[in-house]
Amino acid sequence: MKKNTLLLVIGAVCLAAAAAVYATGASAVQTAREALAALQEDYSKVQAIAYTGFVDLDSEAPVSLDEMLYFPVADSEVGTMADFRALLGRVYTQSKAAEVLDYCTGTTRVLTERDGRLYRADAYEPGWPIGPELEGAKWDGDALTVQVTLEWNEPVPGVVTLRPEGGAWKIDGIAQAA
């Protein structure tokens, strides 16, 4: 009788472990979907301002700085560098937000501020357009690694790392899949 009881206990433990693994996998995908959906509007605005340039610009008030032509950003929500930093902070972790800001103001120099207004160069980069479908997601400690499609001219597999910060899921990394 003890042998049968032991087998039942082992079977129950294995079943519980399998259910936990399945549930974790399912909840990772669901959590990723919900997190990316919550970020979508702000993420799209970051893409427009930081990369593609598909944001309203005031073409009547250009400024030439360091041999580049800039136009004031004509967006009701993002009109200053502080507004843009706040937008980045809603989408990205602190470290990733700093990286994106440095890229925009240093590496590519598409953004600058003058007299308290945010200015953008009239330039285009493809950015990181995340497709609507998730290919999968898995937990990595407290982070989520999400397989997505980056919708460039030719869609390619991508990986987004989401991490909780300040009570919300934020993007901590995004890259083309290896």
PLM feature spans:
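Surface-exposed, charged secondary-structure patches
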Residues: R109-W152
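Core segments of small alpha/beta cavity-forming domains
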Residues: T31-R114
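Gram-positive cell-envelope targeting signals
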Residues: M1-Y43, L88
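Low-complexity, intrinsically disordered/propeptide-like segments
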Residues: V9-G11, A18, A137, Q147, ...
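Long, acidic/polar, low-complexity amphipathic helices and coiled-coil-like
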Residues: K2-T5, T149, V160
